[in-house]
Design a protein with these regions (language model features):
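C-terminal coupling/interaction segments
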Residues: 2-4, 8, 282-329
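ABC transporter nucleotide-binding domains
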Residues: 9-14, 19-216, 221-222
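Generic beta-strand hydrophobic packing signal
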Residues: 15-17, 30, 263-266, 304
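Surface-exposed charge patches
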Residues: 107, 125, 252, 292, ...
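Conserved NTP-handling cores and scaffolds of large molecular machines
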Residues: 112, 193, 212, 233, ...
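Hydrophobic C-terminal alpha-helix "anchor/cap" residues
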Residues: 158, 253-257, 293-294
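ABC transporter nucleotide-binding domain
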Residues: 183-281
């Protein structure tokens, strides 16, 4: 790790970041932070401004206005100082195909001013951590699969023991097995360094990240832990109920325990069974008692199950919001 320095309240700060290209605004009034040791998912539709924001934070692009800091150091006022604390792996990270893995990482360690006495040690360490020693040692980068090239990119990012790592789409184009390996690798960084990661694979973000920041059209629409966002953005609980009762009979029982309950039109399945969707307020006590209520009433039931909302549902709800609603979250 870099030389000891006071622990800042936030490892990464974006404050009112704005980036304009003439009349086109790519990022507008965007504010969020990443705490030391925290893994944060940075999400948004295509063209939302994610890569632009990451480039501004990494110092590879200047913003039009606003403030960006890495470990308390201004990216605009002291870019070299900020970059000493930072590693950035862009989307489609280019690598020299005619170099061997160890050669490339050794060169990168020297370029990053790793102490000469520690270069070999650091190369061995990141190769071990990224599962490259056993699978890629001595091989040309051009001979590696895309998954292992991504590992080389992440190993490069970790060489100088940065306090902050920014990863733009690190799992793009990988198969499920490769994605799992990268996910475990990123998860292992928790507590050691702050990680900001963008990805379109929402399930992986949900598995790895402590919280998420969601932007749309360059503006913040939601941020926080997924459990908190689920309560905020998805205020209803849905149940699938398969029964032989009529919609009116089911609705009467549901509204008896929760007046705000609704029963959506059913879909006939087979042998007289119908599949309904029952919707309750998310905080309703009836969520805990609905199954017991229906069974106690003698309702013929084949299935009752509560819907589980994931990050995809949160993402869809968030990207339908206005920026003003996002700032209030």
């Amino acid at each position: 790790m870099n030389e000891a320095a006071p622990l800042p309240e936030a490892a990464v700060v974006a404050e009112k970041l704005t980036k304009r290209y003439g009349s086109l605004t790519a990022v507008e009034d965007l504010s969020f932070s990443v705490a030391p040791g925290e893994i944060v998912g940075f999400l948004g539709p295509n063209g939302a401004g994610k890569s632009t924001t990451m480039r501004i934070l990494s110092g590879t692009m200047s913003g039009t206005s606003g403030r960006a800091t890495i470990w308390g150091v201004s990216v605009a006022l002291d870019p070299a100082g900020a970059k000493r604390h930072l590693a950035y792996m862009p989307e489609n990270n280019p690598l020299p195909e005619d170099m061997r893995v160890e050669e490339y990482l050794t060169l990168r360690a020297r370029l990053k001013d790793v102490a000469p006495s520690r270069v070999d040690e650091r190369v061995r360490k990141v190769m071990d951590d990224c599962d490259l020693t056993r699978r890629a040692s001595g091989r040309l980068i051009g001979q590696l699969s895309k998954g292992f090239r991504q590992r080389v990119g992440i190993a490069d990012a970790l060489l100088a023991e940065p306090r902050v790592v920014i990863l733009d789409e690190p799992t793009i184009g990988l198969d499920p097995h490769q994605i799992l390996g990268i996910r475990d690798l990123i998860r292992s960084l928790r507590g050691q360094m702050a990680v900001l990661i963008s990805s379109h694979i929402l399930h992986e973000v949900e598995q790895v990240c402590d919280k998420v920041v969601i932007i749309n059209r360059g503006r913040l629409v939601a941020q926080g832990r997924t459990d908190d966002l689920r309560r905020e953005l998805l205020p209803h609980a849905g149940f699938t109920v398969v029964t032989k009762a009529s919609q009116a009979e089911l609705a009467a029982l549901c509204t008896a325990v929760e007046p705000a309950a609704t029963v959506e039109d059913g879909v006939a399945t087979d042998l007289g069974w119908t599949r309904y969707r029952v919707v309750l307020p998310a905080q309703s006590p009836a969520r805990e008692t609905l199954a017991t209520t229906l069974l106690s009433a003698g309702l013929p039931l084949r299935e009752i199950a509560e819907e589980r909302y994931g990050l995809e549902d949160i993402f869809l709800a968030a990207t339908r919001r206005t920026p003003a609603e996002g700032r209030r979250s």
